[in-house]
């Protein structure tokens, strides 16, 4: 197919000026074209993040999902707002993809926001929000992670159980003791 050959030629040439044209493929109503665009952008050696984020806002659901997956794959922390927007306004399928992508686009600066979202998340959103909090904390030293999570647990009141998985992910014995104690008192 000519479109496929042309697309892969652009990828092989690798000129970053082709990125917006490749990102346009995500806006197609043809799922095969969207998948071609996703594969091409995933293989492209340059910085695709800005063009992909721009395409997500006006793409159909398949293109939004493909774009979110690309942003996650590229760890596009600068484009976290694109992912957060889709959590707010996307269709159920797009929201699910945005929640999955979230853990890959968060950084240390997003800890407070991610904790707030975890504490207000509905039941289906809790697991991906916990993964996002764990990811946001990951650049901190372990002792700081434990301290930050323990502080958030105190602030969360009766929603402190939401942080058990996050606290356990630190692997610290005192953190694990807190989790065990919490389970015992809540069961």
Language-model features: locations:
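Repeat-mediated protein-protein interaction surfaces in helical alpha-solenoids
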Residues: 46-50, 145-150
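Extended interaction regions within the primary functional domain
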Residues: 6, 143, 150-154
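HEAT/HEAT-like alpha-solenoid repeats
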Residues: 18, 114-115, 145-149
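Structural detector for internal amphipathic alpha-helices that build alpha-solenoid repeat scaffolds
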Residues: 3-15, 24, 32-46, 51-54, ...
């Amino acid at each position: 197919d000519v479109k496929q050959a042309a697309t892969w030629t652009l990828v092989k040439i690798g000129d970053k000026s082709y990125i917006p044209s490749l990102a346009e493929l995500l806006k197609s109503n043809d799922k095969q074209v969207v998948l071609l665009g996703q594969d091409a952008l995933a293989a492209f050696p340059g910085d695709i993040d800005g063009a992909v984020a721009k395409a997500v806002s006006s793409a159909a659901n398949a293109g939004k999902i493909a774009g979110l997956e690309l942003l996650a794959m590229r760890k596009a922390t600068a484009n976290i707002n694109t992912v957060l927007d889709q959590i707010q306004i996307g269709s159920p399928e797009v929201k699910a993809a945005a929640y999955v992508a979230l853990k890959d686009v968060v950084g240390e600066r997003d800890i407070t926001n991610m904790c707030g979202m975890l504490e207000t998340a509905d039941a289906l959103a809790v697991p991906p929000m916990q993964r996002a909090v764990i990811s946001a904390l990951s650049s901190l030293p372990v002792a700081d992670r434990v301290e930050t999570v323990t502080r958030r647990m105190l602030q969360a009141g009766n929603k402190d159980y939401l942080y058990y998985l996050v606290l356990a992910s630190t692997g610290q014995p005192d953190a694990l003791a807190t989790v065990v104690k919490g389970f015992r008192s809540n069961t």
